[in-house]
Amino acid sequence: MNPVDRPLLDIGLTRLEFLRISGKGLAGLTIAPALLSLLGCKQEDIDSGTVGLINTPKGVLVTQRARCTGCHRCEISCTNFNDGSVGTFFSRIKIHRNYFFGDNGVGSGGGLYGDLNYTADTCRQCKEPQCMNVCPIGAITWQQKEGCITVDHKRCIGCSACTTACPWMMATVNTESKKSSKCVLCGECANACPTGALKIIEWKDITV
């Protein structure tokens, strides 16, 4: 089966492993009031998708759509910190493409989450990473020390196979460097967010 056609939850990290509970993950779970307070949202916000929860090895990235103003500071901070240059297209956190950017540019179609809808998105650090599986030279590997899947820029040939294979198209090839990049869980996006639309909550602070 083409990896893009596989169900998203089959590809992503199982929330069972992260939460150490049985049954469904955060998106379908009745969350304890104390944890909801920590996440800064209500149960109905999670159920409706207004609040997004992206599980990573280091913690949960909480995205609150209603708080996002589309200022792009998260993307700017990400690329400045990781690349030494500023560019929203090759940012590891994705905001711009989720507004009204279609496949062929501005105004050509709805964003991934609907028109006029800012939604932060980034790498899920998949348990079975399709980006890593399809890389023809093995430039994408799991790094135990960093706790994430990374791209070795010395080996990357910029073929974009990783982007095509990812169901969310998260790995992005920088058109200037010709190298692919993806989230390394540095947290700069959340640090730069002026409205609290992005938060990273470490697993040690989450109990269920």
Curated annotation (Swiss-Prot):
One of its GO terms (molecular function) is 4 iron, 4 sulfur cluster binding. CDD domains: DMSOR_beta_like. Pfam families: Fer4_11, Fer4_4. Induction: Up-regulated by the oxygen-responsive transcription factor FNR under anaerobic conditions. Repressed in the presence of nitrate or nitrite via the two-component systems NarXL and NarPQ, respectively. SUPFAM superfamilies: 4Fe-4S ferredoxins. It comes from Escherichia coli (strain K12). [4Fe-4S] cluster 2 binds at C78, C183, C186, C189. Residues 59-88, 114-145, 147-176, 174-203 form the 4Fe-4S ferredoxin-type domain. Keywords: 4Fe-4S, Iron, Iron-sulfur, Metal-binding, Repeat. Disulfide bonds: none annotated. [4Fe-4S] cluster 1 binds at C68, C71, C74, C193. InterPro entries: 4Fe4S_Fe-S-bd, 4Fe4S_Fe_S_CS, RnfB_subfamily. [4Fe-4S] cluster 4 binds at C135, C156, C159, C162. This is Uncharacterized ferredoxin-like protein YdhY. [4Fe-4S] cluster 3 binds at C123, C126, C131, C166.
